[in-house]
Amino acid sequence: MASKSADIRPKITLACEVCKERNYITTKNRRNHPDRLELQKFCPRCTAKTAHRETR
């Protein structure tokens, strides 16, 4: 059975919107952010700061 903290804060992968490479793994709080997370992060493949969006 999964722990309570894993249910509330699942691991998510952030993928670059430009090249679709999955660069970052993080956790998020489902209660505060039920929608897909989108952050500005550095993409080493694009060598630029681009939007990274949560993947399923």
Swiss-Prot record:
GO terms for MF: structural constituent of ribosome
UniProt entry keywords in alphabetical sequence: Ribonucleoprotein, Ribosomal protein
GO terms (BP aspect): translation
Keyword Ribonucleoprotein carried by entry: yes
Transmembrane segments: none
The keyword rRNA-binding appears for this protein: no
InterPro entries: Ribosomal_bL33 (IPR001705), Ribosomal_bL33_CS (IPR018264), Ribosomal_bL33_sf (IPR038584), Ribosomal_zn-bd (IPR011332)
Gene Ontology cellular-component annotations: cytoplasm; ribonucleoprotein complex; ribosome
Similarity comment: family membership: Belongs to the bacterial ribosomal protein bL33 family.
Protein name: Large ribosomal subunit protein bL33
Species: Beutenbergia cavernae (strain ATCC BAA-8 / DSM 12333 / CCUG 43141 / JCM 11478 / NBRC 16432 / NCIMB 13614 / HKI 0122)
Species classification: Bacteria, Bacillati, Actinomycetota, Actinomycetes, Micrococcales
